[in-house]
Amino acid sequence: MNSCAFQFRGVPLAALGSGAVWWAEQSMLCVSDLHLGKSERMSRRSGVPAPPYEVHDTLSRLEDDIAATQARVVVCLGDSFDDLAAAAALPEEARLWITRLQAGRRWVWIEGNHDPGPIDLGGAHLAEMELGPLIFRHIAQDGARGEVSGHYHPKVQVPTRARVISRPAVLVDDARIILPAYGTYTGGLRSDDPVLAGLMGPEARAIVTGAHPVMVAMPR
């Protein structure tokens, strides 16, 4: 399992290449912004069919991470569904797949701005969740400490010998972690955007996702 280990508020964590964060002591896998049903919502609103493969791709990667970690707890940090109508319109195959992934483990859906209400799937539905020194919620709050959130879909630009590439990234400073979007068809906000630059402290680091996740100083 390719990962990048780091400490946060005295807790040993690891960022996986997928953008998930793994808390081994709690056997907890944390992901954010799955945006399941995004292609359905795009088609519904625009009338233009979108490729319907994003749900399968996202759930496949989630299944792989669960298998690799043998997680007993899965926390989804909000915007797990692109909207509540998209959640209701999930194909039966996808609903059964989620049910299989939930079997034998605790599953927590944190409310997001795209999916603020309860959904017709198993698991607990919470506005936020505290565990030890950490608090899990969808959107970062000013002044928070030990906060793990998502929402902003952070990404960084990485120079290579050939060109500059853009990759999703886990942002970490002394107060908070912001996870990238886990879902397929999700865009991102560059770490040098004033919103993220304002949220993250001067010591912030970025863990660049991919086959070999690596920690760098957060680009500003």
Segments from the language model and where they lie:
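Extended recognition/assembly regions associated with phosphoester-bond processing machinery
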Residues: 1-76, 80-220
